[in-house]
């Protein structure tokens, strides 16, 4: 038991959230560099400047499917063992991105300091709110001209509704960027750009009133002292309890491209971020230091190579210890399975897992029996909660080139929806099939997989659907009346749950006003 507790206490499991182009890929790489997880030789190719260097296993090669190793990286740092879960950006954005956030204990939010809070960040923060996930903030790109730091923090507070506590404070920006003042340590760290894989030795001046500071940065020292008077008066002090409740975020400034400030973030995560947390189930709360193994599946990644129908189910370990060859109980189907070939992810290598502890992520080979949200135990029958389906944001009607294959199409879509690749809706009043997704890439993936795995050729057509909501009502009679009057807007999803398909947001809002007893839900438990 005590061995387990030691391992649990070491773990920190977090994800990085940001708007595309805020620097997430760079920061992921630099976090691995500071964690010594990025091997210096053989893994980096890029222009001589190193600016475009990208480790091979982070290149998302769509033509052969996204390499599984992009998803989980584990490395030691400061006496802890850090699990970093990547959330795909850009067009790879999908429901997976949202669901990954249900498997972590904290998040690092990266903001482009020239732009401030952007819409993708707002959406991702809404998801972290479902579980009050603690958030660490990094204001990136200080080597460029940025917006006023106090304005940036005000925007985070107002738009994202979370208090900000600055931990480091920038001295200048762009060409005049001199470094940061670490408020809690009362020290100035001078900026020296370390590009690519060079981590410069820290130049630190102890104390804001140290005369050496004036020698090093001239008039910027006096400006910093004045500014700190203002900042101390106007901003929040760091409060660990408020951070753990998701009410306050510690804010760091730096430049990931210049390898500066990343170590401050990692120090903060190791010192303050929660170790693996207890998890709710439908019967009780599962504590991480329990002896028996438990875990849940939050993501299924299909290998898009048709020769290998290898799908990997990503499982977050919640309690106990995974050992190679152990027997697990797959609760939903009521079967025991022997797991001898689970994968672990150490610095981008796909290795067979010898063991794994709470907070770790392991990959199970899945031949179609595992679904998102599935719980695995050592025999106990319960289901972990908190792995939701999210209302899609994009919709297409899907149509067959060969109308005789309707049955295969429906079967394929239902199976893909169980896996979480896409959501499917069957309107009550028509024979249409509507596919819903969070990101464009999901549509492409589905057509490709229908063809390779189900031998079905399908095409998409536009459809005037703006959003979807799952519909619930405690009063069976009122639900039946609603179903009768609004049938032209109702559909069943892949799991036969009643769903309201709204052509416009105005239509949805009117229906919500007209039927106050009906709940229109944005998320649904798996």
Swiss-Prot record:
Molecular-function annotations in GO: GTP binding; GTPase activity; guanosine tetraphosphate binding; translation release factor activity, codon nonspecific; translation release factor activity, codon specific
Key words of the record: Cytoplasm, GTP-binding, Nucleotide-binding, Protein biosynthesis
Residue ranges of domain tr-type G in the record: 9-277
GO biological process, one term: regulation of translational termination
Pfam families recorded: EF-G_D2, GTP_EFTU, RF3_C
Keyword Protein biosynthesis: yes
GO cellular component: cytosol
Job description of the protein: Increases the formation of ribosomal termination complexes and stimulates activities of RF-1 and RF-2. It binds guanine nucleotides and has strong preference for UGA stop codons. It may interact directly with the ribosome. The stimulation of RF-1 and RF-2 is significantly reduced by GTP and GDP, but not by GMP.
NCBIfam families hit by this protein: prfC, PRK00741.1, small_GTP
Protein name (Swiss-Prot/TrEMBL): Peptide chain release factor 3
Gene giving rise to this polypeptide: prfC
């Amino acid at each position: 038991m005590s061995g387990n507790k030691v391992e649990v206490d070491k773990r920190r499991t977090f994800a990085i959230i940001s708007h595309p182009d805020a620097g997430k890929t760079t920061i992921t790489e630099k976090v691995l560099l500071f964690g010594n997880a990025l091997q210096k030789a053989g893994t980096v190719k890029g222009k001589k400047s190193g600016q475009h260097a990208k480790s091979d296993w982070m290149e998302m090669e769509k033509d052969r499917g996204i390499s599984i190793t992009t998803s989980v990286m584990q490395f030691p740092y400061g006496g802890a063992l850090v699990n970093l879960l990547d959330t795909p950006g850009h067009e790879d954005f999908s429901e997976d991105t949202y669901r990954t956030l249900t498997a972590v204990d904290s998040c690092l939010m990266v903001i482009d300091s020239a732009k401030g809070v952007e819409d993708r960040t707002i959406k991702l923060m809404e998801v972290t709110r479902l579980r009050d996930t603690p958030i660490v903030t990094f204001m990136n790109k200080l080597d460029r001209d940025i917006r006023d730091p106090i304005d940036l923090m005000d925007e985070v507070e107002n738009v994202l509704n979370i208090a900000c506590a600055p931990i480091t404070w920038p001295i200048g920006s762009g060409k005049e960027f001199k470094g940061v003042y670490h408020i809690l340590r009362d020290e100035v760290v001078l900026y020296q750009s370390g590009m690519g894989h060079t981590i410069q030795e820290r130049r630190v001046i102890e104390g804001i009133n140290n005369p050496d500071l004036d020698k090093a940065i001239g008039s910027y020292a006096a400006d910093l002292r004045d500014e700190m008077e203002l900042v101390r008066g106007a901003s929040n002090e760091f409060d660990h309890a408020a951070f753990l409740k998701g009410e306050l975020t510690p804010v760091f400034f730096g430049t990931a491209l210049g390898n500066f400030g990343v170590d401050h973030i990692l120090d903060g995560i190791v010192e303050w971020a929660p170790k693996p947390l207890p998890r709710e189930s439908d019967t009780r709360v599962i504590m991480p230091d329990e002896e028996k193994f438990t875990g849940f599946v939050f993501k299924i990644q299909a290998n898009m190579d048709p020769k290998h129908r290898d799908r990997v189910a990503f499982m977050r370990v919640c309690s106990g210890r995974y050992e190679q060859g152990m027997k697990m109980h797959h609760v939903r189907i009521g079967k025991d399975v022997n797991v001898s070939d689970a994968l672990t992810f150490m610095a981008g290598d796909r290795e067979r897992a010898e063991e794994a502890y709470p907070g770790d992520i392991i990959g199970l080979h899945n031949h179609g029996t595992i679904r998102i949200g599935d719980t695995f135990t050592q025999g106990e029958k319960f289901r972990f909660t908190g792995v939701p389906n999210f209302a899609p944001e994009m919709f297409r009607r899907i149509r067959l080139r060969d109308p005789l294959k309707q049955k295969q199409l429906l079967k394929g879509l239902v199976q893909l929806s169980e896996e979480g690749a896409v959501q499917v809706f069957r309107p009550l009043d028509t024979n249409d099939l509507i596919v819903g997704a969070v990101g464009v890439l999901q549509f492409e993936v589905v057509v490709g997989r229908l063809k390779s795995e189900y031998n079905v050729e399908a095409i998409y057509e536009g459809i005037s659907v703006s959003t979807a909501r799952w519909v619930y009502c405690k009063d069976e009679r009122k639900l039946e009346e609603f179903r009768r009057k609004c049938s032209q807007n109702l559909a069943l999803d892949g799991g036969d749950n009643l769903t309201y398909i709204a052509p416009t947001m105005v239509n949805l809002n009117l229906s919500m006003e007209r039927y106050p007893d009906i709940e229109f839900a944005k998320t649904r438990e798996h």
